[in-house]
Design a protein with these regions (language model features):
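Conserved hydrophobic positions within beta-strands
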Residues: 80-82
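Charge-dense, low-complexity intrinsically disordered regions
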Residues: 489-556
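Acidic low-complexity segments
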Residues: 84, 89-139, 144, 210
Length: 556
C-alpha cells in the first residue's frame, strides 16, 4: 500500500465537462467510405510503405514496416483495396500533408490469421520486437513507441505506472475504457510487468472517476496478482502528465533531460496497456482506438474508431450543433485546431471537440504582459513563463533555453490564467520549433564542414605522397649519376691487364663462332639455279659474321 500521496507544484482546476460524454457506453463506429492511414503513426519516425495502388489487403495486414529503433509498423484497419499512396492532411499544428495510404474498404472486414503470442517462453527483446511489429504506441496523445518504453533502462524498472488520470476537460475515453475493459487493461499491465521486470504496478486515476476506480479495483481482485494497487489521486490539471503523476504516486521528481527509467519508474496510458493485451493475447495489431466526441454536440459519447477514419465521417455520430464553427483534436488545454475535416484519426487521437462562439468564445485581444506572476504560480514545471514569453517574442532563444524552455510540457496552465490573454504556449511552441530548426541546420552545416575538412586533409595527404615519390625518384637519379661519374673517374688499365682482356675476348669470340657455325646445306637434290642461290646466301652470312667480329686492340 502507498503510505502517502505527494503534490506537484502549480496546476489549475478548470471545469471538467466529463459527464456530457461519460454516461453512455462505448459504441463502435461504422466502416467509413475510405481510410487515410498516415505512414507516420509513432511520434518519432515514418514507416516504410509495403503496398502498391490496386493491391488488396486484409484487416491487420502490415502495410508499412518499422525502420529504425523509434518506429512502429502500420497495418490495414480493415480489408479492402489500396486506392493510392499520396500526401494527405494530418493532425499537426503545421497543417502540412504527410505520405499516407488511402484504402477503400470492401465491407467484409476480413481479418488476417491471428495467433496469440507466447510471451512467457521467449526473451523480453523478442516480445518488444513483436509489439513494434504490431504497431503499439502510447495512446495518451504522445504516440511514443511502447516497445522502447518497455526496455530495461539503466537501472531496471521497479515500478510500472498505469496512467488513468485523464485530467484534461471533456475527454472521457480512458474513463469508459476502465469501466468496460478493466480486465484487459490489467492483463496488459501484467504482460508489461513481465517484459520490463517490474516489481509492482500502480494505477493512478483522478478521484472524479469513482466508477472507473471501482471497476479497476474489482479487476485487480479477479486477476489475483500481488503488488498491484489502484490509487485515487486528487483532481488537478495536469495530474495526468507523466512527470506529475510519477511525482504524485512516488515522490520522485524527474528533471529535464532524464526519463522515468533513470529512476526505476515507467508510465503507460491505460489504453496502451489494453492495446498490448489485444496484441499478445489475440494477435491483433493496433488498428482502432476509443476516442471521445464531445463539445458542441447533440449526442456526445465515446466511439471505437478505425485508425485512418476521416473526421468528417465521424461527426454525424455525435451530431454537431448548427452553430459549431471549429474543431479541436484533443482537449481545450493542449489540443490542436483541425484545419481540415478530411484529417484522419491517428493512434494518438483521443478526442474531437466541437467548438462554438458560445461554448468556446474567441479570445479577447492580446494585451501587454503586466508581469503579475500568475503564470509562474500555476506552472507545474516550476518555470517562469513570463520570462520565457519575453525571450521567445524577442527571438532571444539562447536565453529562453537558459530559462529551461524545454522543461515546458505545454500544458496550457499559464495561458489559462493569464489576465492579458497572451497565448503563452503558442510562443513557447514557436520558440521550440525555431531552436529545433536551427539545431537541424547547424547539424547539417557541421556535417558539411566535417566533409570539407576531410577532403582537404585527403588532398594534402595525396600532395605529400606525390612530393615524397618525386623526391625519391630525384634521389635515385642523383645516385645513378654519381655512380657513373665515379666509374668514369677510375684510372686506365695497365698493358698486362689489356693483354689479358684481349685473350679473354678472343676466347669468347671463338666460342661464339663455333656456336653460330652453320652446317652446309644438303643441296645435292637442288637444281643448279637453287644451288647458286644457296651459295649466295651463305656468302652473305659469312660477310655478316666477319663484320660482327670485335676489333681487338693490339699492344704497341
Amino acid at each position: 500500500m502507498i503510505a502517502r500521496l505527494f503534490k506537484f507544484k502549480g496546476g489549475v482546476k478548470p471545469a471538467s465537462h466529463k459527464d456530457e460524454s461519460a454516461a453512455a457506453p462505448i459504441r463502435v463506429a461504422p466502416l467509413p467510405s475510405h481510410l487515410i492511414i498516415p505512414l507516420r503513426q509513432s511520434a518519432r519516425a515514418m514507416a516504410r510503405c509495403l503496398v502498391q495502388p490496386g493491391q488488396t489487403v486484409l484487416k491487420g495486414e502490415m502495410i508499412a514496416a518499422a525502420e529504425g529503433p523509434l518506429c512502429t509498423a502500420v497495418h490495414a484497419p480493415t480489408s479492402g483495396t489500396v486506392r493510392a499512396i499520396a500526401p494527405q492532411p494530418v493532425p499537426h499544428p503545421s497543417g502540412l500533408p504527410a505520405p499516407s495510404v488511402i484504402l477503400d474498404p470492401d465491407g467484409q472486414d476480413r481479418w488476417i490469421e491471428r495467433q496469440p503470442f507466447d510471451y512467457r517462453s521467449v526473451p523480453a527483446q523478442e516480445t518488444r520486437t513483436y509489439l513494434r511489429d504490431c504497431g503499439v504506441v502510447g495512446l495518451g496523445g504522445a504516440g511514443f513507441p511502447s516497445h522502447v518504453k518497455l526496455g530495461p533502462g539503466e537501472k531496471g524498472i521497479e515500478t510500472l505506472i498505469l496512467n488513468g488520470a485523464e485530467c484534461e476537460p471533456w475527454i472521457t475515453c480512458d474513463d469508459r475504457l476502465m469501466r468496460e475493459r478493466a480486465d484487459g487493461i490489467l492483463a496488459g499491465a501484467s504482460i508489461m510487468r513481465h517484459i520490463a521486470g517490474a516489481r509492482r504496478i500502480l494505477v493512478g486515476i483522478e478521484d472524479n472517476k469513482p466508477q472507473a476506480i471501482e471497476s479497476m479495483r474489482a479487476a485487480v481482485q479477479r486477476l489475483g496478482e500481488a503488488d498491484i494497487e489502484v490509487v485515487a489521486v486528487p483532481t488537478r490539471y495536469p495530474a495526468g502528465g507523466e512527470k506529475q503523476l510519477i511525482r504524485v504516486l512516488t515522490g520522485i521528481e524527474i528533471p529535464y533531460g532524464k526519463l522515468g527509467t533513470h529512476f526505476g519508474v515507467q508510465c503507460f496510458n491505460v489504453g496502451s496497456a489494453h492495446a498490448i493485451y489485444r496484441a499478445v493475447a489475440h494477435g491483433e495489431p493496433l488498428v482502432s482506438r476509443v476516442l471521445t466526441l464531445s463539445g458542441n454536440m447533440t449526442h456526445p459519447g465515446n466511439f471505437e474508431v478505425l485508425i485512418g477514419t476521416p473526421i468528417r465521417e465521424l461527426l454525424p455520430l455525435a451530431a454537431p450543433r448548427a452553430d459549431t464553427d471549429r474543431y479541436l483534436m484533443g482537449g481545450p488545454m493542449m489540443g490542436v485546431a483541425l484545419l481540415s475535416l478530411d484529417t484522419p484519426v491517428i493512434k494518438g487521437t483521443n478526442c474531437i471537440l466541437a467548438g462554438s462562439p458560445t461554448l468556446f468564445p474567441p479570445p479577447p485581444p492580446e494585451m501587454p504582459c503586466i508581469r503579475c506572476g500568475e503564470c509562474a504560480k500555476v506552472c507545474p514545471a516550476e518555470l517562469q513563463p513570463f520570462e520565457l514569453y519575453w525571450f521567445s517574442r524577442a527571438r532571444i532563444f539562447g536565453k529562453a533555453q537558459d530559462y529551461s524552455l524545454f522543461d515546458c510540457i505545454e500544458c496550457g496552465c499559464c495561458s489559462y490564467v493569464c489576465p492579458s490573454r497572451i497565448p503563452l504556449v503558442d510562443y513557447f511552441r514557436f520558440a521550440k520549433g525555431e531552436i529545433w530548426a536551427r539545431e537541424k541546420e547547424k547539424a547539417a552545416a557541421d556535417i558539411a564542414r566535417e566533409r570539407y575538412e576531410l577532403r582537404l586533409a585527403r588532398e594534402e595527404r595525396e600532395k605529400e605522397e606525390k612530393a615524397a615519390k618525386l623526391a625519391a625518384k630525384t634521389e635515385a637519379g642523383r645516385q645513378k649519376a654519381a655512380a657513373a661519374l665515379a666509374e668514369a673517374a677510375k684510372p686506365a688499365a695497365t698493358p698486362e691487364e689489356d693483354a689479358k682482356k684481349a685473350l679473354i675476348a678472343a676466347a669468347l669470340e671463338r666460342a661464339r663462332a663455333q656456336k653460330e657455325q652453320v652446317h652446309p646445306e644438303n643441296v645435292s637434290d637442288l637444281t643448279p639455279e637453287q644451288q647458286a642461290e644457296v651459295a649466295a646466301i651463305e656468302g652473305r652470312r659469312a660477310e655478316i659474321r666477319e663484320m660482327a667480329k670485335p676489333h681487338l686492340r693490339q699492344d704497341d
